[in-house]
Every structure is written in structure tokens, then in C-alpha cells.
Amino acid sequence: MQEYLEKRYALALYEIAEKNNKVDEYLRDLTDICDIFDENKEFYEVINHPKINTAKKKQLFTDLFKGKIDEELLSFMMILIEKDRILQLREILDQMEKIDLERRNTIRGIVKTVVPLLDEELEQLKAIFEKKYEKNILFDTKIDKSLLGGVYVKVGNDIIDGTIKSKVEEMKELMLKKE
């Protein structure tokens, strides 16, 4: 039930953002606000405190964000406060990002390497997966020294693990089976 509501809120906000041609702005602002929740324990406690009434919470948000975020986004936040759903903002943002990717015919992938890939190498990987999925691919690249070498790629349900670490583990398993 909770996820259903989060999707509905996300879709409603996405449609407003899309109508106003501010999808990227809303996503960026929501991310920043969620980061404030995550990084500022006192702020989170005030928002979560049952004895602080809705009017005070709304005033706090107005004081903090009026003039810094779009008025319609601020109004949306007021609705979340009224409905006691402001603490689900991260989940609503996650759903909104999924909607955005879907509307842009895009999926996310992860590329892990020991050293950064050259732009050309990343573009080659991207082209391979875009052809396979017939979607745009957005890769999150991560440096992971524990891989020892090679590359790890995950897109959708596909995983390509060409890392030295995985090869060593495979050899270790083979050697242990033979004993």
C-alpha cells in the first residue's frame, strides 16, 4: 500500500514538473532536500516529532525553502506534511526518478573498474548495451580496488564480471572441489 501511494505522489509531481518543463529542477531540488533529511539529524527529528504540530512543520519548510525551490514543489511538500508523508520523500523521489528514466527510454547500469575507463571505452560499453536493450544507458561508474583488474558491468538483469577477483574466486572454487 505504501509503495502504491509513493508512486501516485511521484506521478502527480512528475506530471506537474513535466507540464512546467522543470523535471530536472524538481529532481535536483528533491535530492537536495532528502540529503538535508539524511545529513541533519536535528531537522529530521523536528519533522518526525509527534508533538510538533503540522502548522509549525509547514512554517519551517516555508522558512527554509520559499524562494529557493519552485512554488508548486513547495506546495507539494505542504501536502506531504499535511498528510503526514513528508518522511517518505526519499521513496517518492526514487519513484519519480524511475518514472523519469522510463519516460526518457533510459535504464541505469553500473560499471566497476580498478582504474577509471577512458571515455571511448565507456562509450563502447554504452553502445553495446543500448543496442541490446534498445534504450539509452546511463552508467554509474565506480572505482573498486578490490576487483584487482578487469571490469564489472551490470545493466538490468545482465551481469558481466570480467574482473580478476572473480577469476581468482572461480579458480579457488575449482581447486577446493578437486580436494
Curated annotation (Swiss-Prot):
It comes from the Bacteria. GO terms for molecular function: proton-transporting ATP synthase activity, rotational mechanism. It comes from Clostridium beijerinckii (strain ATCC 51743 / NCIMB 8052) (Clostridium acetobutylicum). It holds the Pfam family OSCP. The keyword Membrane applies. It is a peripheral membrane protein. This is ATP synthase subunit delta. Belongs to the ATPase delta chain family. The gene is atpH. SUPFAM superfamilies: N-terminal domain of the delta subunit of the F1F0-ATP synthase. One of its GO terms (cellular component) is plasma membrane. PROSITE patterns: ATPASE_DELTA (PS00389). F-type ATPases have 2 components, F(1) - the catalytic core - and F(0) - the membrane proton channel. F(1) has five subunits: alpha(3), beta(3), gamma(1), delta(1), epsilon(1). F(0) has three main subunits: a(1), b(2) and c(10-14). The alpha and beta chains form an alternating ring which encloses part of the gamma chain. F(1) is attached to F(0) by a central stalk formed by the gamma and epsilon chains, while a peripheral stalk is formed by the delta and b chains. It is found in: Cell membrane. InterPro entries: ATP_synth_OSCP/delta_N_sf (IPR026015), ATPase_OSCP/d_CS (IPR020781), ATPase_OSCP/dsu (IPR000711). Its main location: membrane.
